[in-house]
Amino acid sequence: DAQARGEGARAGAYRYTECRLRPLAEELLADIDKNTVDMRPNFDESLMEPAVLPARVPNLLVNGSTGIAVGMATNIPPHNLSEVIDGTIALIDDPDISVEALCEHIKGPDFPTGGTVYGLNAVRDLYMTGRGKIKMRGKAIIEEEDSGKARIIIHEIPYALNKTLLIQKMVQLVRDKKLEGISDIRDESGKEGIRLVLELKRSAVPNVLLNNLFKFTQLGSTFGAIMLAIDKGKPRVMNLKEVLHCFVTHRFEVITRRTQFELDKAKARAHILEGLLIAMDNMDEVVRIIRDS
């Protein structure tokens, strides 16, 4: 919950998340015991681990990913599960589909903390080229009180923004008198979501103050997206269609290997059954051999 509210908490222990993530995790691990993916030693060679998950779900786009290595970095935004699956089905139905047509199914990133994406050109660039700078803003409303005062209530913040750091930044700007008109800042976030309350002075102009918040704080920020991923052992930047195509190809390989595994298992079983049939047809001879042994 602390992570969902943008409080910058560390990653939760397995026991905190396993119940909610179990259905999706089972889809990611489905058929892993049927030789569907290659196995390799882990970091200390004490165990074998999958080189990649079988993954019935296109999790790279759904969950997003961020990371940095020598000479490269990736920053893939999360997407809506239903939209990504619709886009994947569209690609399967029409392998020659264009990126523009895929965008009819996948409208854009789906940031869990909410906020507003300003300008779709950056999203289009991301899907066409694999790179894009997405401008985001938090969402806020202005409430007028009978006393003549007003308050700004922030209920959504940009993705990956640490709420605590945002509050600290606003407090510092007020102290430095770069953000005037705020008399109090309260964090009323809870299970219902994010709620930051900024009490304003009578002399404050709410809309001007809100614009200054977007200008001087991370309430207005940019998500530098780059869809870099490992494809056949090599890192490369991919557009939307290429990412989905890699997933479809991967699933084809998984299903092929699963089918071969089940066929080999059935053949082994058939070999045993053939032997049993021969034994049943020659029961007297089998009994004689056993007695004489």
Predicted stretch roles:
Residues D1-K133, R195-V197:
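Catalytic phosphate-handling regions of large nucleic-acid enzymes and associated NTPases
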Residues Y14, E18, L81, K163-I167, ...:
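Generic alpha-helical secondary structure
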Residues I141-I185:
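Long hydrophobic segments that form regular secondary structure
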Residues D1, G6, R10, I106, ...:
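Long, charged, helix-rich clamp/arm modules that form nucleic acid-engaging surfaces
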Residues R20-D31, L60, G64, M72-N75, ...:
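Generic, well-ordered alpha-helical scaffold segments in large soluble proteins
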Residues A55-V57, M72, A122-R124, K169-M170, ...:
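Short beta-alpha junctions and helix-cap segments that line functional grooves
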Residues G138-A140, H155, L196-L198:
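Preference for bulky hydrophobic residues occupying beta-strand positions
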Residues Y127-A140, E188:
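Solvent-exposed "coupling" segments
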